[in-house]
Amino acid sequence: MAQSSSAPLQALNVRVYPIFTVRWLAVHVLGVPTVFFLGAITAMQLIRR
């Protein structure tokens, strides 16, 4: 009896996605300074003269 291909064990085409994409750059260019400044502003609120 021949092997049935109704439930393949391995995908035929496996895509390898790049890590650094335009979306990744956009998210990090906007996100990293935003988190930094939010942390800096929060720290400034806690300073008592």
Curated annotation (Swiss-Prot):
The disulfide bonds in this chain are none
- What processes does the entry annotate via GO biological process terms? photosynthetic electron transport chain
Q: Which cofactor does it need?
A: heme b
Q: Which GO MF terms does the UniProt record name? A: electron transfer activity; heme binding; iron ion binding
Q: What is the lineage of its organism?
A: Bacteria, Bacillati, Cyanobacteriota, Cyanophyceae, Synechococcales
Which residues are heme-binding?
A: 28
Q: What does this protein do?
A: This b-type cytochrome is tightly associated with the reaction center of photosystem II (PSII). PSII is a light-driven water:plastoquinone oxidoreductase that uses light energy to abstract electrons from H(2)O, generating O(2) and a proton gradient subsequently used for ATP formation. It consists of a core antenna complex that captures photons, and an electron transfer chain that converts photonic excitation into a charge separation.
Q: Which family does it belong to?
A: Belongs to the PsbE/PsbF family.
Q: Where is the signal peptide?
A: none
Which Gene Ontology cellular-component terms appear in the entry? Answer: photosystem II reaction center; plasma membrane-derived thylakoid membrane
Membrane topology category? Single-pass membrane protein
Q: What is the protein named?
A: Cytochrome b559 subunit beta
Q: Which UniProt keywords apply?
A: Electron transport, Heme, Iron, Membrane, Metal-binding, Photosynthesis, Photosystem II, Thylakoid, Transmembrane, Transmembrane helix, Transport
- Spell out the InterPro entries in the cross-references: PSII_cyt_b559_bsu, PSII_cyt_b559_CS, PSII_cyt_b559_N
Primary residence: membrane
Q: Which residues cross the membrane?
A: 24-40
Compartment annotation: Cellular thylakoid membrane
HAMAP family per record: PSII_PsbF
**Assembly with partners or alone:** Heterodimer of an alpha subunit and a beta subunit. PSII is composed of 1 copy each of membrane proteins PsbA, PsbB, PsbC, PsbD, PsbE, PsbF, PsbH, PsbI, PsbJ, PsbK, PsbL, PsbM, PsbT, PsbX, PsbY, Psb30/Ycf12, peripheral proteins PsbO, CyanoQ (PsbQ), PsbU, PsbV and a large number of cofactors. It forms dimeric complexes.
Relay the cofactor remark from the entry: With its partner (PsbE) binds heme. PSII binds additional chlorophylls, carotenoids and specific lipids.
Gene this protein is translated from: psbF
